[in-house]
Swiss-Prot record:
Catalytic residues as annotated in Swiss-Prot or TrEMBL: E276 (proton donor/acceptor)
Lineage, broadest ranks: Eukaryota, Fungi, Dikarya, Ascomycota, Saccharomycotina
Region described as Interaction with histone H4 N-terminus: 52-54, 202-204
Task of the protein: Catalytic component of the histone acetylase B (HAT-B) complex. Acetylates 'Lys-12' of histone H4 which is required for telomeric silencing. Has intrinsic substrate specificity that modifies lysine in recognition sequence GXGKXG. Involved in DNA double-strand break repair.
Protein name: Histone acetyltransferase type B catalytic subunit
Organism whose genome encodes this protein: Yarrowia lipolytica (strain CLIB 122 / E 150) (Yeast)
Length: 451
């Protein structure tokens, strides 16, 4: 073994995280007597702490442990190694100090000190921060979500402890501005009052004239504008989103997203619900949750009914014109889709993706217009791809090259959409079936069957 290998440790393997449960259930909790099982796991990423190569240099048999109380997240950092490399004039970064830079100042490095703090914090019984926001159950296990803001001192203290999971489990994840009062935090507790996950949400305030309010004329003076009545609305942006590894694989992420979305949607002051820089895994979760929710709202049946009467080139409802070859949809669809996007409070790109996946689900439905529906689905999807990538596509050259690239992109998207849709296709098809209940008097709709 060469010296480089002998004194080098993979940081992802060296760092272990331990969630130490507290004893007891119900309103009060005491320090664990060691009979409960601890959760031990490794991070996915350590490059924000230990550099791009994620290695720790200068130690043999190096082990670093971040222990946290499972309910309060009080942190303790301990280290073990068999030997340390020392050269005159050469020094290595202290891996403990590097980790402590990402943790709150209260982090203990002595286990006796940490146990003393645990006793003090849990002495009067454990109480979750914030107020109860909602509940959900998975496999007969109940989970409670609490909402709070960083203006609350206890919530801020908990957030400073929790935020270490962001760089360790979210690629390119970064800390938020703790002094910004627009941040909300949603914390998920299990029946034992252990934290199983959390999400931070940012509130963007902006003003939109309500339907009942008259808009100021274009030539209005500043004084007139200042007197103009407006209704405050906000955009909820889901930012950090973490389900801790011991509790993953149970569907908790989808349940939390569904709870957040449904509650935000029900708030009349919320104009739009967005997600900040989602990972591929979160994109899949979000797509499937949104598709299930749209199916529950009956949106697939609305799309299907429109496809029976109005082509992709339609300028108004019932316009069945065909034959145009340009990648463009009629003005009616542009307006119809925007009205429904606003109705369902989804961001532009997300609503477009969900609509396109529902279109593809409609292609599996037998109907007199099925052949045209297939062509229309391609037109809708290619249109969005073309608009979003216009500059790149125009650099390809002539029309043949552009159309070829669009077809290639469409086929790739169709394959990815099928992968995403597979677990929730049944929900979407159920949404399509709603047309029979909604249009009991429509004989053509009655004849349509889901294959």
């Amino acid at each position: 073994m060469d010296i480089a290998t002998e004194w080098t440790t993979n940081a992802n393997e060296a760092l272990t995280i331990t969630l130490e449960p507290s004893k007891g259930k119900g309103k009060g909790k005491e320090v664990s007597n060691g009979s409960e099982k601890s959760h031990v796991f490794n991070p996915i990423f350590t490059y924000p702490i230990y550099g791009d190569v994620e290695t720790i240099l200068g130690y043999k048999n190096f082990e670093l442990n971040l222990k946290m109380d499972a309910s309060t997240m009080l942190p303790l950092v301990t280290v073990k190694f068999s030997d340390k490399l020392e050269f005159d004039g050469i020094s290595f970064d202290d891996p403990v100090e590097r980790l402590l830079e990402f943790l709150p100042e209260e982090t203990a490095t002595d286990e006796a000190e940490w146990e003393e703090k645990r006793v003090k914090e849990l002495g009067d019984g454990f109480k979750p921060v914030g107020k109860e926001f909602g509940t959900f159950s998975v496999n007969s296990e109940k989970y409670t979500v609490h909402r709070s803001t960083l203006l609350d001192p206890e919530t801020l203290k908990l957030h400073l402890r929790l935020q270490i999971f962001v760089p360790l489990f979210i690629e390119a994840g970064s800390y938020i501005d703790n002094e910004d009062d627009r941040w909300e935090i949603y914390i998920v507790y299990n029946a034992e009052k252990e934290i199983v996950g959390f999400s931070t949400v940012y509130c963007y305030w902006f003003y939109e004239p309500s339907a009942k309010e008259s808009k100021a004329p274009k030539d209005a003076s500043l004084e007139q504008l200042q007197k103009q009545p407006f209704s405050p609305t906000l955009r909820k942006r889901i930012s950090q989103y973490v389900i801790l590894p011991p509790f993953q694989g149970k569907g908790l992420g989808g349940q939390l997203y569904t709870l957040l979305f449904s509650r935000f949607y029900a708030d009349p002051n919320v104009y739009e619900i967005t997600v900040e820089d989602p990972s591929e895994a979160f994109d899949d979760l979000r797509d499937r949750c949104d598709l299930k929710w749209l199916a529950d709202q009956g949106f697939p049946s609305e799309v299907f009914r429109m496809l029976q009467t109005t082509s992709a080139h339609g300028e108004k409802a019932g316009d069945n014109r065909t034959g145009r070859t340009k990648v463009v949809a009629g003005a009616f669809w542009t307006k119809w889709l925007e009205e429904h996007r606003l109705k369902y409070k989804l961001a532009h790109r997300q609503f477009a993706r969900c609509f396109e996946m529902i279109l593809l689900a409609c292609l599996e439905v037998s109907s007199p217009t099925k052949k045209r529906n297939i062509k229309d689905a391609r037109l809708f999807i290619k249109k969005r791809v073309y608009v979003r990538n216009r500059e790149f596509l125009e650099e390809l050259g002539g029309k043949i090259e552009v159309m070829s690239k669009l077809q290639e992109t469409y086929e790739s998207m169709e394959e990815d959409y099928a992968r995403i849709m597979k677990p929730v296709l049944g929900y979407v098809k159920d949404g399509l079936k709603k047309r029979d209940r909604n249009d009991a008097g429509n004989e053509e709709a009655k004849r349509v069957k889901v294959e």
